[in-house]
Amino acid sequence: MASTLLIVSVLLMNLAGCTSQFPAPHQEGSSSLGYAQTSAPSARSNGEPRRRSVAIDGVTLSILEAGTGDPVIFVHGVVTTSNIFSKYLSAYSPDFRGIAVDLRGYGDSKKPATGFTIKQFSKDLIALADKLSIEKPVWVGVSMGGMILQQLALDYPDRVRALVLVSTTDGAMVLDKDLPTIGNPRDFREVSKNIIVESFPLGTPPALYQPLLERILTWNGTVLREALTSMATANVHGRISKITAPTLIVVGAKDDVATPAIAHGIQLQIAGAQLVEFNTGHFMMAEDPEGFRTVLGNYLRGLSR
């Protein structure tokens, strides 16, 4: 069981005190996975984010956006949605405009028959940027989102202004060989309950993870199964040395999922990459949201200099 917890949890999303190493600067069968959300026709330039739908290549994606300025696109992990980024979208306006996307099958985005893979998610993100007339955004990815963005940066290097990789992995680890054989979508949800708890440091107040546990039963197991299986086979280790975009890596010192050792390994492979380490576990943005907001803001402002 410990092996299963370690492996599937590496596939889960990081939800930021910290040591800086860079210069101061739905139910089963439904169409979504994650939080219940309400669509809105337009985005506010500042303040509370607004939601709207964007049609791309046969699938409709739901996005949250707020603020003005240069675009920053946020990508969530395997068991969350765009809502985890809502407090950050207008935080850096008027210099940066925040856009958070529900990946296909998640949140308010449509769920096609297939395509819930790292590769397809990255293609969808480029199609979304095209539809929004965004050439080179800053990309921020958490856990699975960070895996997607490493693939995106390799496949579309000219579409990346900068990367922020949060609590993620390059796939350089031993994966549970039994993971692809877990066939029942409900099994993924049951395993995920344990993983969520195990991903927080001992002594974490249950209030931080209880909302996630309560939403497990609404997650679409089919989407979760395909995404987790894709994550179990994804591996860009040794190839990300080709990434030339400015990169910030963020990791929790107590993260047993995407460990500090993995983060340091990614830093060594990407020339000039900067690293920030927080005193948190895997769900960093739940444990220290204000710390994460500050670090991301410092990095974004540094890009503008």
Regions found by a protein language model. Give the residues of each.
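Short beta-strand/loop motif that positions the catalytic acidic residue
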Residues: 243, 249-251
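Flexible "cap/lid" loop of the alpha/beta hydrolase fold
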Residues: 147-155, 160-190
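Acidic catalytic loop of the alpha/beta-hydrolase fold
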Residues: 254-258
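Alpha/beta-hydrolase fold catalytic core
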Residues: 2, 6-72, 95-96, 218, ...
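Active-site loop/oxyanion-hole signature of alpha/beta-hydrolase fold enzymes
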Residues: 64, 90, 100-140, 144, ...
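Conserved HGGG/HGGXW glycine-rich cap/lid loop of the alpha/beta-hydrolase fold
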Residues: 59-108
